[in-house]
Amino acid sequence: MDTSQRIFITGVTGYLGSAIATRFVRAGYKVYGLTRNPERAADLTARGIHPVVGTLSNPGTFLPALKNCDAAIHVAFDPTDVVKQDQLALEAVRTGALDGRVRRLIYTSGAWVHGDTGGRVIDESAPLNPIDLVRWRAAHEDVAADLSEHEVKVIVLRPGIVYGGSRGLVGGMFAEAHELRALGYPGGSQYWGMIHRDDLAEAYLRALERGQGGERYLLADGSQLTARQVAEAIAEVTGVQARPRETSEVLKQLGLLGRALLTSQKLNPGRARRELGWTPKHTSFVRDAAELDQEWLATRGTAVA
């Protein structure tokens, strides 16, 4: 892959987008990152990212930059109006292909489009049964795939639950343990398909360089851990007690997100390993929990002992 090519990334200051952008910069690509906050521009520049200040709701703020890029990576997730924002992003990529030079798109979906898998291990061939939180996503995967009609090579990535650093769902569990000196977790027996965000960023790079257009890839570390095992590992390294929360409490507090966290999934990332040459370095959250706790402390700006 020609690393002089230009890559446009949405959500570049977000939990996933920041890690993905950093990995592409390290690989030598010219990265253009969309951010809503002009105050973040200097920080992005210092990290080797060309800041593009704008919003998905106003494509005119970023289309000139997008049209001049060779590939787009859509990672941004705005919970306030996620469906509309996602539609606008895909339409912008279409415009970038018709009127510009965009010829590749990596579209971020998620493993939750497969719904609850129970005790079964699934791969990409499993039927889609999206949970309510992401009910719209399966249709948007198809919209993204249709961009192939405009000579865009489209790859859809379906990550599981991402961990690492201080943000995200699992980062919130570390925060609860440290700040409240207690840890409640949803359910317990349900399986979570875990993936470290650095491994996820590597998968995006491999997908751009090696992925086949039209393919979908599940991304997880293959560890098949339950929510209880994740919570107990955090509790052990932070010195607190972990307790299961009643389902009614989880749903009342978190709504559709709570239902998502109660979803059980066993994911097989074999296709990504075979076709992308992707091998996650972090393969056991439980084994790495102490290191992950130190990573959480460091990224929160706390002195690490």
Feature locations, PLM:
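N-terminal Rossmann NAD(P)H-binding glycine-rich loop of SDR-like oxidoreductase domains
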Residues: 7-27
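NAD(P)H-binding glycine-rich loop region in Rossmannoid oxidoreductase-like domains
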Residues: 35-96
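Conserved Rossmann-fold NAD(P)-dependent oxidoreductase catalytic core, especially the SDR/UDP-sugar
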Residues: 91-133
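Glycine/proline-rich active-site loop of Rossmann-fold NAD(P)-dependent oxidoreductases
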Residues: 138, 162-174, 206-217, 223
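Conserved beta-loop-beta element that borders a ligand/cofactor-binding pocket
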Residues: 141-165
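A conserved pocket-lining segment of Rossmann-fold NAD(P)-dependent short-chain dehydrogenase/reductase
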Residues: 175-195, 199
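Mid/C-terminal beta-alpha module of Rossmann-like enzyme folds, strongest
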Residues: 203-257, 297, 302-305
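Amphipathic terminal alpha-helices
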Residues: 283-305
